[in-house]
Amino acid sequence: MDAGKAERRAGNGRRTDGRRHLVVAAACAAFIAAMVGVTYASVPLYAMFCALTGFGGATRVGAAPTSAPIEREITIRFDANVAPGLPWAFAPVERDVTVKVGATSLAHYTAANRSSMETHANATYNVSPPQAGAYFVKLQCFCFDEQTLAPNEKLEMPVVFYVDPAIAQDPDLKTLTDITLSYTFFPAKTPDKAAARASGTGG
């Protein structure tokens, strides 16, 4: 009888430990999901998240290249997206360009406000494949600042960039021939004073 009771107690203990582990795992998963959700809800936090983790192929912001271009060429493809709630048309002028690695290059996007109101937006960005983000360096980009378009205004926005020659030393990217640079514009919060002026209630 004593042996049977001991076995039952041991079995109950194992079940309790198993439930405890499941609860801890579920709590961790919920915390991670909540953090990712909060991050995506805020464009500035999203950019910080990408910069810290490399998630989605976050690119580098840097100075002009210090070494000469190399002979290797890579085709850069451009992608454009607009989040729901932003009445903009947004597209790349050039669908793709082939550049020498290490050479400073220029591309353009256009954005048009299709509404009758002034609108403000911020752009997030990423590179595919994600590993290439560490070597894609932007010198000038509309994504660095909030963009404002007047009613029905259309704007051409440049991107100045280069691919760091150090990519040639990365064994995982030695056969890479294409990189996709993707942007998504999200609505930005209008400052209170600007909103008040637009509604006619401001001083």
From Swiss-Prot:
Q: Which GO terms describe its molecular function?
A: copper ion binding
What GO biological process, any one, is recorded here? respiratory chain complex IV assembly
Cellular compartments annotated: Cell inner membrane
Question: In this UniProt entry, which residues form the Cytoplasmic topological domain(s)?
Answer: 1-19
Provide the transmembrane region boundaries: 20-42
Membrane topology value: Single-pass type II membrane protein
Read off the SUPFAM superfamilies from this record: Ctag/Cox11
InterPro entries membership: CtaG/Cox11_dom_sf, Cyt_c_oxidase_assmbl_CtaG
The signal peptide, as residue positions, is none
Q: Does the keyword Transmembrane helix apply?
A: yes
**Could you tell me what this protein does?**
Exerts its effect at some terminal stage of cytochrome c oxidase synthesis, probably by being involved in the insertion of the copper B into subunit I.
Family in the record: Belongs to the COX11/CtaG family.
- Name under which the protein is recorded: Cytochrome c oxidase assembly protein CtaG
Upper taxonomic classification of the species? Bacteria, Pseudomonadati, Pseudomonadota, Alphaproteobacteria, Hyphomicrobiales
Write the gene name: ctaG
